[in-house]
């Protein structure tokens, strides 16, 4: 199977031409576009192969959690798009486990302290509401979502022993994904969590993620972690590999 992995297209700022022709499966690891616009784009541009679609934080901008998630799932029905949010799908003998994931704000210490810092600095907590109250999303909310997703993922991997397993999240599972120049910044705890113990326990074959606009590729044990972000259309070239295909 030939898998094309991309994240962070950020089409709300402009759309790039991408060739998906030589892939058997496309994985979009979050921040494709706002709301259901990314789903509409996939329907128009990637019609001949399955697409696994993960929500990033930006899908929720100008929307609400979980209302936007429900809208995206509904928009994907009866199409070639599989939305994974705390959900696993088996395809040609490979199990794909997907979630936005968010973070636990615990990279550097107290999740309360760093949650407060990140809530003040991240646009997520100004741009996203929560339903049914329509009050602003808070760091405690995404912390709770992260904990639920982590529990689900551990259970899903536990039940998938003996299979080839690929985990797909928007947020990163290790500080190793953070560029060196940002590794000690408090706000980095809104980009990654330390899930290396989970990786080492279950050793999925791959963990694909996005959110961080710098490509990375490294191993934790036998698991290869890959981030291949396109980034904003007006950003300086970040090393994104337009031709990256993972063959399994």
Summary of predicted features, one role per range:
Residues 1-4, 88-98, 219-224:
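Beta-strand-turn-beta hairpins that frame and shape the catalytic cleft
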């Amino acid at each position: 199977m030939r898998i094309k992995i991309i994240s962070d297209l950020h089409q709300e700022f402009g759309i790039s031409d991408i060739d998906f022709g030589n892939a058997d499966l496309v994985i979009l690891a979050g921040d494709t576009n706002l709301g259901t616009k990314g789903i509409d784009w996939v329907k128009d541009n990637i019609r001949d192969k399955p697409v696994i679609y993960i929500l990033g934080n930006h899908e929720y901008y100008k929307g609400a959690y979980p209302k936007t998630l429900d809208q995206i799932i509904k928009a994907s029905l009866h199409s070639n798009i599989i939305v994974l949010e705390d959900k696993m799908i088996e395809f040609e003998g490979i199990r794909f486990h997907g979630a936005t994931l968010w973070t636990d704000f615990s990279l550097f210490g107290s999740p309360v302290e760093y949650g407060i810092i990140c809530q003040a600095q991240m646009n997520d907590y100004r741009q996203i509401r929560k339903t049914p109250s329509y009050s602003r999303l808070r760091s405690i909310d995404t912390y709770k979502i992260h904990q639920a997703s982590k529990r689900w993922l551990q259970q899903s991997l536990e039940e998938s022993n003996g299979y080839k397993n690929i985990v797909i999240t928007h947020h990163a599972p290790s500080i190793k994904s953070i560029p060196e120049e940002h590794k000690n910044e408090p706000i980095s705890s809104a980009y990654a969590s330390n899930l290396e113990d989970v990786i080492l326990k279950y050793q999925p074959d791959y963990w694909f993620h996005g959110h961080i606009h710098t490509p990375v590729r490294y191993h934790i044990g036998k698991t290869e972690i890959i981030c291949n972000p396109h980034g904003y259309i007006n950003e300086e070239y970040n090393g994104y590999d337009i031709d990256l295909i993972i063959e399994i």
